Every structure is written in structure tokens, then in C-alpha cells.
Swiss-Prot record:
Residues 341-370 are annotated as: PPI. This is CBL-interacting protein kinase 10. Signal peptide: none annotated. Residues 13-267 form the Protein kinase domain. It catalyses: L-seryl-[protein] + ATP = O-phospho-L-seryl-[protein] + ADP + H(+); L-threonyl-[protein] + ATP = O-phospho-L-threonyl-[protein] + ADP + H(+). Its cofactor is Mn(2+). GO terms for biological process: signal transduction. Keywords: ATP-binding, Kinase, Manganese, Nucleotide-binding, Serine/threonine-protein kinase, Transferase.
Length: 451
């Protein structure tokens, strides 16, 4: 169905005016026909999220919103689906974004503290359930009719089960100005500590009316973030400065935790004791939404070709990932030591299938074992041990757009000189699929010129 004002969705909800839209979804005001309750209806296009490999992200968003049912978090009431659309029926928060309030000027200290207390309470609740938001910013903080805070947009959230064996998260997420130094570093990071950093940036913004880390040059901004280089507004009290110093600590190991923030004297002024409870009264939240994932998402994979099926397994890059992976913007050199693994990258206008086939052919010609892994990860291994064991190279394909990919080589094991030799032999053999090696000028070819 085409969503228009006055349409009835599955005989249960009346669709009202359009509230907002993005690349993959539109959000409408809605009304529950049975009880006249106002709701927000998020309409997601199945085909678009399938093409951009966001199906798992949508599934995760449903799972996360069921885990974090808290008065300061936007509630998910129901999930419905047709053959082409997925519908999230959400709590309607009519007070607008906290960002719009800050845009008119900085907040009074007691008002900023109230919102910060509610934010920390909700984040503490999320973390206690193994959920990390990873995209906290004023634009994702809404206000209800009573001017209470509601966290929204769990699309980038990570579950504790998404951690690797080292107990850390490894996917770069978030909005650059609010991202923690260790996330920019592109090493593993603690999701809880990264959320704490973002909360600190938000508190600064609420009290100052502007960001702590600003620069027209994004690289300079990242350097400031990594060094926690910012200035104190004259109106910041000593108690606020003391707390923010501990939150905006560039070292996650010594950065203050959520539980420590909740014990801070400035934080506890006028604190509502209900916010300290991880167990929320059942009358303040709605029941858990039970979703049949198979019927909601359907078997869409049968409707796509082999090339798209392969693309579904790739890692998708958001804008921050692309900046981080780009040679001109990669700040990892600021942190890595001489013993870090060697990497090289190239971009390609070919499909993932074509890139994989070419890499397999080149590996065979160089007498390397070739193995396909999940998530667009390919592995090449030498046939016999060298000075430092068997050389092992990972080649990972990232999708930037459906027609544009980034391939990253990483030496996992073996002798560096042997790796450099193999890499030099691979470069001319890969020329047919390489648009540009990172750090070099691209070939004079537009993305539209590919055959």
C-alpha cells in the first residue's frame, strides 16, 4: 500500500502526517483505532534494506528495543509486515528533539543536569542488559510532553553477543563529533566506555551550547578528540569540570564508568531516586513485543540474483567507516606501534563476485591457498613455512555502494619481507579490477564509465 494520510494500516492504525524520512524509512504520526492512542509508525522498505544489507541491522534493532524497556527510552509497541514493507509501531514523543532546544542556546545548569541524569539512567539500564547504543547525540534524544528525555534510534546498537573473543567491539559506529578516541583508533573498544564518552560530549553541548571538539578540517577534529583537547567555557563550575575531565578521558582504561558517574556529587543534586533503579515498575513500560522474524522479513533472498546474494554477506560501511579507512583520514598511525599488522587497500568499481574471482585466480597463480570466509573475508596462505611461520593474508571486501567496493589486505602471520614480495607481485595482476590503491591518485575514470 502507498502510505497516505487517512490510510488504515491492517485495520488497526490510522496513518497521519509525515513526521520525517531517511534513505530507508519514513515515519508517520498514527492513531490506534481501538483506543485512539497516538503512535509513531516507522515504515521500512524491505527491498532497500535488502540491497544495502541492512536486514540484520533491522532484526537487531527489534531485539534491542525489546531488551531495553525503560521510561527514558522510546518504546516499541508492535512490529507488522507486508510483502514489501516492515512497520514499527512506536511510542509517539511529541516534544521534539533535544537538539532543537540546544540550538536556541545553552541550557541552565539544573535543566542540563536533569536531562543528563535521565540519559545516564537509561544508558545504565541498557548496559545492564548488554546493549550499547553507539550513536548517542542530541538528535537522538527526544522530549515528551512533560519535558522528560527519551532515547531513540537503536539502529547502530550492539549487543554483548556481538563482541569478539577479546570482549571488545570492532565495528566503527557513531557520529564523528561524539565518537570516542578508541573508536577512531579502529582497534577493539568497550561499548560501555564509548557510550560514556558520548554522554560527556552531550553534557558539554547542553551546558555550553556548542561542541567541545570543533574544526573545519575533520582530521584536526579527530586529533583534538584523541588528545581530549578542548576549552572550558568560563561559566562551567569546578564540579562540572571535575566530572567532565573524568568522562572525556582519552584513555578508556581510566575513564569514569556509568556507576561512578551516578555517585558523583554534581550528578546527584536533585536526583530522582527512581532513576537509580535498574528494575523499572511494570506499569511504566509496555509488554515485550513478540515478533515472528521469518514471517516479518519473509524469504526475500529468492528474489535476488547471485551477485546480490554474495553482496549480502559483505560488511557495509557508513560515512565514518569510509573516512576511517581512507588513507588520508586513517588516524590509526597516531596509535599503532612498529609491530602492528601491515595493511594495504584498494577501491574497485567491480562487483564483489568479480573481485573474489580475480583474487582467487591471482592467489592460485602465486601458489597460495585460497579460502572463503563469512562476511566478505577471504584468506590466502603460503604453501610452506617461512622464517616466521606460514604467511597468512586476509583480504576483506567492504561495500561502499552496490557498485563501489573497498578491499583491505592485512598480514596476519609470517615474514614481513615475504608479504611485501607477494604484495608487489599481486599489484600488477590485480590492475583489471583496481580503481585506485589508497594513497595514490585514482585512474581518470568516473564511476559511471564502468562497463
Amino acid at each position: 500500500m502507498v502510505e497516505q494520510k487517512g490510510n488504515i494500516l491492517m485495520k488497526r492504525y490510522e496513518i497521519g502526517k509525515l513526521l520525517g524520512q531517511g534513505s530507508f524509512a519514513k515515519v508517520y504520526h498514527g492513531r490506534n483505532i481501538k483506543n485512539s492512542q497516538s503512535v509513531a509508525i516507522k515504515v521500512i522498505d524491505k527491498e532497500k534494506i535488502l540491497k544495502c544489507e541492512l536486514m540484520d541491522q533491522i532484526r537487531r534493532e527489534i531485539s534491542v528495543m525489546n531488551l531495553v524497556r525503560h521510561p527514558c527510552i522510546v518504546q516499541l509497541y508492535e512490529v507488522m509486515a507486508t510483502k514489501t514493507k516492515i512497520y514499527f509501531i512506536l511510542e509517539y514523543v511529541k516534544g521534539g528533539e533535544l537538539f532543537n532546544k540546544v540550538r536556541r542556546g545553552r541550557l541552565k545548569e539544573e535543566v542540563a543536569r536533569k536531562y543528563f541524569q535521565q540519559l545516564i539512567s537509561a544508558i545504565d539500564f541498557c548496559h545492564s542488559r548488554g546493549v550499547y547504543h553507539r550513536d548517542l547525540k542530541p538528535e537522538n534524544l527526544l522530549l515528551d510532553e512533560n519535558r522528560n528525555l527519551k532515547i531513540s534510534d537503536f539502529g547502530l546498537s550492539a549487543l554483548a553477543e556481538c563482541k569478539r573473543q577479546d570482549g571488545l567491539l570492532h565495528t566503527t559506529c557513531g557520529t564523528p563529533a561524539y565518537v570516542a578516541p578508541e573508536v577512531i583508533n579502529r582497534k577493539g573498544y568497550d561499548g560501555a566506555k564509548a557510550d560514556v564518552w558520548a554522554c560527556g560530549v552531550i553534557l558539554y553541548v547542553l551546558l555550553a551550547g556548542y561542541l567541545p571538539f570543533q574544526d573545519k578540517n575533520v582530521i584536526n577534529m579527530y586529533k583534538k578528540i584523541c588528545k581530549a583537547e578542548f576549552k572550558w567555557p568560563s561559566w562551567f563550575s569546578s564540579d562540572i569540570r571535575k566530572l567532565l575531565r573524568r568522562i572525556l578521558d582519552p584513555n578508556p582504561a581510566t575513564r569514569i564508568s556509568v556507576s561512578e558517574i551516578m555517585e558523583d556529587p554534581w550528578f546527584r543534586v536533585g536526583l530522582n531516586s527512581d532513576l537509580l533503579n535498574k528494575t523499572i515498575p511494570t506499569d511504566k513500560v509496555d509488554k515485550v513485543v513478540h515478533v515472528d522474524m521469518d514471517s516479518t522479513f519473509g524469504n526475500l533472498s529468492n528474489n535476488i540474483n547471485e551477485g546480490k546474494q554474495e553482496a549480502e554477506n559483505l560488511t557495509s560501511l557508513n560515512a565514518f567507516d569510509i573516512i576511517s579507512l581512507s588513507s588520508g583520514f586513517d588516524l590509526s598511525a597516531m596509535f599503532e606501534d612498529e609491530n602492528s599488522k601491515e595493511e594495504s587497500k584498494f577501491t574497485s568499481t567491480n562487483t564483489a563476485t568479480t573481485i573474489t574471482k580475480k583474487l582467487e585466480d591471482v592467489a592460485k597463480n602465486l601458489r597460495l591457498k585460497f579460502l572463503k570466509k563469512n562476511g566478505g573475508l577471504l584468506k590466502m596462505e603460503g604453501s610452506k613455512p617461512g622464517r616466521k611461520g606460514v604467511m597468512s593474508i586476509n583480504a576483506e571486501i567492504f561495500q561502499i555502494t552496490p557498485d563501489f567496493h573497498l578491499v583491505e589486505f592485512t598480514k596476519i602471520n609470517g615474514d614481513t619481507l615475504e608479504y611485501q614480495k607477494v604484495k608487489q607481485e599481486m599489484r600488477p595482476a590485480l590492475k583489471d579490477i583496481v580503481w585506485a590503491w589508497q594513497g595514490e591518485q585514482p585512474q581518470p575514470q568516473s564511476l559511471n564509465e564502468q562497463s
